[in-house]
C-alpha cells in the first residue's frame, strides 16, 4: 500500500493542514518513516504520535512539522495539542473501523502538519488537527479524490488560503464587458457598477491598452481581483512576445488579429499555452474564418466574430458558428461582438455563441448595473459559487 491523503480544516491562525502518506513498514513508506526518525533537521524534528506519555497510537505515526519551530511556544504547541490531536484522531479511526481491512501492525503513517507561528488557541489547534487527520486518513484509504471529482472541481473551485479565484471559462454562456475607453475614471466607474457575477468577463479594450499600456490590467485587477480579464491587443506581429507580455501583466486571455500571418497566430497561441492563458482570434475583416481556423496547426481557445464599430449597423450577422467549431476539431468557444444588444441575445445564443461581447450598451448606459443585469438575465445562468464553501464536497 502507498496511499496519499490531504485535508484542510478550520480557519484563522489555528487552521490545520495535513498531508499524509500511509503504507506498509516493509515498503517505501516504512523506509521514509525510519529515515524521518533518524535524519533530524533543526526546527523540523519529527515526533511520534502518542495518546499520552508512553502510549503510541497505531498505526505508528510520525508527525513532521511543515513550518520551522523557532521558539518554545511553537514547540509546546506541536508536542501538546497537535500531537494529542493526531494520536487521538488515529486511535478513534481504529474504533470506527477505518482499518478493518488492514493489520495496523503492518502499517505506518507520515503526517506533515502545518502550524502557523501565530497560532495561540490550544482548543482550536487540537480540534482542527483532530478533524484534519481523520479526514486526510479516510481520504487516503478511499483514494479520494476520484478523477471525476478532480475534473469537475478544477475550474470551479477556489483555494481557501490563496484569497482569490482564478477564473476559467467552463460554464458558457458568458457576458463580456468590453471597455473601449480611454478614461481611467470611467473604467473605475464601470468596474464598480458592473455586478460581481461568475458569468461576467472584463475586457481591456484596444484603445484602453494603447492609452495606458498593459499596466492597465493590473489596475483592473486591483478593482476586480477575481475577474477573468482579456487583453484585447489584436496582435499582428511578434506573436510569442506580445502573448507573453499579456500573461506577465496577469491577463487571463489575449486577443490575436485574424489578419496576422499564420505563423504569427500560431506562435501567439503556442505562447498562451505555455503561460496558461486563453488565446482569442479576432476575425474582424477576415474573409473566411472557417478556412483560417481549419488551416492553423494549433487551434485557439476562442474565436471572436467581430463586426467593427464603424459598420455594425450595416454588416451581416456573425456567420456560421457551427462550421467554425467543426473546423477547430475540438473544444472551442465562439464570441460574438459588435452591435450586441439585449434584443439580439437570444438570436446569438441560438446560433451557437458562447460569449456575448457588449461594449457601449453597458459602458455608456446611464444605469450600468441595470443594463448589465438585463443581459445576464438573458443568459439564464445562476452564479456558480454564490452559496459555496470552498472546502466542502
From Swiss-Prot:
Active-site residues from the entry: 17 (proton donor)
TM spans (from-to): none
SUPFAM superfamilies membership: Ribosomal protein S5 domain 2-like (SSF54211), Ribulose-phoshate binding barrel (SSF51366)
GO molecular function: 3-dehydro-L-gulonate-6-phosphate decarboxylase activity; carbon-nitrogen lyase activity; hexulose-6-phosphate synthase activity; hydro-lyase activity; orotidine-5'-phosphate decarboxylase activity
Keywords (A to Z) from UniProt: Carbohydrate metabolism, Lyase, Multifunctional enzyme
Entry EC number(s): 4.2.1.147, 4.1.2.43
Catalysed transformations (reactions): 5,6,7,8-tetrahydromethanopterin + formaldehyde = 5,10-methylenetetrahydromethanopterin + H2O; D-ribulose 5-phosphate + formaldehyde = D-arabino-hex-3-ulose 6-phosphate
Annotated metabolic or biological route of this protein: Carbohydrate biosynthesis; D-ribose 5-phosphate biosynthesis
Binding site residues for substrate: 19, 48, 66, 68, 83
First-level EC class: lyase
Annotated segments matching region 3-hexulose-6-phosphate synthase: 162-393
Superkingdom of origin organism: Archaea
UniProt-listed GO biological process terms: 'de novo' pyrimidine nucleobase biosynthetic process; carbohydrate biosynthetic process; L-ascorbic acid catabolic process
Family designation: In the N-terminal section; belongs to the formaldehyde-activating enzyme family.
Function according to Swiss-Prot or TrEMBL: Catalyzes the condensation of formaldehyde with tetrahydromethanopterin (H(4)MPT) to 5,10-methylenetetrahydromethanopterin.
The protein's name in its UniProt record: Bifunctional enzyme Fae/Hps
Native organism: Methanosphaerula palustris (strain ATCC BAA-1556 / DSM 19958 / E1-9c)
Lineage per the UniProt record: Archaea, Methanobacteriati, Methanobacteriota, Stenosarchaea group, Methanomicrobia
